């Protein structure tokens, strides 16, 4: 383990029996107040392009937990990648009564989507989000399934992310003002704020709030970043 106490770049050399190794190590200033905007359930031709436009206008990168794209929407996923966002997986499908039948079925649901993304875009995805989150109760028709999956998922090569800021854009939020208020009052300085939003079809509540949320965050000292495999994972308490 190598740690750095000062910001800067140094070069580390190592010598073996047959080879000499070199590694450039960069230590960056730690960012304390981070917002990770995440979008579930896309892509679709109505909402996703509008989200991408708003992010581009504000020079913000985000994370998209996608379902299997329709063939006509393959270009939207490509745009997500091309514009520097993190492509992540929500699953090949989202039907609770299917994906949580067993560990094997859930793993197949992720593997199938990852293989599709790799074949189509050359991107090997490792970030995932459970339909309903790891704290879901919709899987209780199969007692203990979430406990078993969350225990094993890292061994399958996946990192899973829940959220600690809920926009409620898919349920209790009645309008864009509600979404804005839910997000901005949920942000906490000194941590990584993982914000749950959705880019499903015609999510106008979220679209009406997104630009204002970004401007609020920047004004109040937050940095917007995409999730990566090295980001500290946010996990809920498992309820099944």
Indicate residue ranges for each PLM-predicted region:
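Catalytic domains of cell-wall/extracellular-matrix polysaccharide-remodeling enzymes
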Residues: 72, 94-196, 200-223, 229-230, ...
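Active-site beta->alpha N-cap acidic-glycine motif
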Residues: 26-124, 216, 232
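Extracytoplasmic soluble-region selector
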Residues: 1-30
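Short acidic, S/G/P-rich loop/turn micro-motifs used as interaction or catalytic elements
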Residues: 8, 44, 202
